[in-house]
Amino acid sequence: MDNFLPFPSSNANSVQELSMDPNNNRSHFTTVPTYDHHQAQPHHFLPPFSYPVEQMAAVMNPQPVYLSECYPQIPVTQTGSEFGSLVGNPCLWQERGGFLDPRMTKMARINRKNAMMRSRNNSSPNSSPSELVDSKRQLMMLNLKNNVQISDKKDSYQQSTFDNKKLRVLCEKELKNSDVGSLGRIVLPKRDAEANLPKLSDKEGIVVQMRDVFSMQSWSFKYKFWSNNKSRMYVLENTGEFVKQNGAEIGDFLTIYEDESKNLYFAMNGNSGKQNEGRENESRERNHYEEAMLDYIPRDEEEASIAMLIGNLNDHYPIPNDLMDLTTDLQHHQATSSSMPPEDHAYVGSSDDQVSFNDFEWW
């Protein structure tokens, strides 16, 4: 046993390798080149190992194992390049007490990782089950809301003209004293005007055509807005003749419609048209709110005339109670009085001087 070496002598240039077939026949041998005995590892690094330390060293530094005639073995390396014929049949390799091919185990790990990634993408692991339920619920509510809006839009065209054109209500206004007066303009509810009527880019406004719902007659109005402290009031101008011909009175309702082609229509309803009490109250509340915000608009012709007159006077004439103006006029009067001739001379002042003097007799 002392002279035993598990590899052939130094003169041997080849070694017989056992080749296994699927039927476990060991009758076939192949010859492969081998190393010189000077290049071979000592026998205590080859199996069987004498001590666990030597076995661990062999695992950390794997070397090819060669067969002897007495103990035929299969050469094994970590890469498995010398026994490629056995890679395709790992079960046979396990039966012999060997290890699996590292390449196959690596591919198996990669396949498992890919499968886990696919499952994570399908189940969205970043979201909890409650979040998934909430997202699905929100999506369902959004779809339901869109369907309701579409159905409401279709159902909003409930009225029609005599030529069967579908109409929907854009704006409704209960006429006030200022709307049917001689000012020739009708104030529209701000909320309805901004939401439904054409958009206005400047104060000049646009010209709109409106057709009577009950006839073929059309009217042309100037649709514009007035600004006041970051707020707006929307009006229809050039309505004087329109009010007269339609016999509009205080308390009547002007309703503006729109057809499916975005054409505008109107209808003038008298006091008998107040059948829907809810709509009437809502319209009154809106009108009261608009008039309260923009209180500077006159309510009748007399107030409008007075406001216009006061504005013109303030722009072109000084305020009578201004002390600076009174002081200036008094100095001018004193200067003209000191330059007048004595009483024994007959001097007739100009009409301007007389007026200026009379103005300050009370001073």
UniProtKB/Swiss-Prot annotation:
Q: Where in the cell is it found?
A: Nucleus
Q: Give the phenotype of cells or organisms lacking this gene.
A: Pigmented seeds. Distorted seedlings with elongated hypocotyl and curled cotyledons. Presence of trichomes and accumulation of anthocyanins on cotyledons. Unusual pattern of storage product accumulation in seedlings.
Q: Which GO terms describe its molecular function?
A: DNA binding; DNA-binding transcription factor activity
Region Disordered: start-end pairs:
1-27, 331-351
Transmembrane stretches, start-end: none
Query: Where is it found, in Gene Ontology cellular component terms?
Result: nucleus
State the SUPFAM superfamilies in the record. DNA-binding pseudobarrel domain
Q: Give the InterPro entries listed for this entry.
A: B3_DNA-bd, DNA-bd_pseudobarrel_sf, LEC2-like
The processes (GO biological process) annotated in the record are: embryo development ending in seed dormancy; positive regulation of auxin biosynthetic process; positive regulation of DNA-templated transcription; seed maturation; seed oilbody biogenesis; somatic embryogenesis
Task: Give the keywords, sorted.
Answer: DNA-binding, Nucleus, Transcription, Transcription regulation
Q: Where is the composition biased (Polar residues)?
A: 8-27
DNA-binding region range list: 171-272
Tell me if Nucleus is a UniProt keyword of this record: yes
Q: Which Pfam families match?
A: B3 (PF02362)
Fetch the PANTHER family from UniProt.
Answer: B3 DOMAIN-CONTAINING TRANSCRIPTION FACTOR ABI3, B3 DOMAIN-CONTAINING TRANSCRIPTION FACTOR LEC2
Q: What does this protein do?
A: Transcription regulator that plays a central role in embryo development. Required for the maintenance of suspensor morphology, specification of cotyledon identity, progression through the maturation phase and suppression of premature germination. Ectopic expression is sufficient to promote somatic embryogenesis.
Q: What is this protein called?
A: B3 domain-containing transcription factor LEC2
Q: Which gene encodes it?
A: LEC2
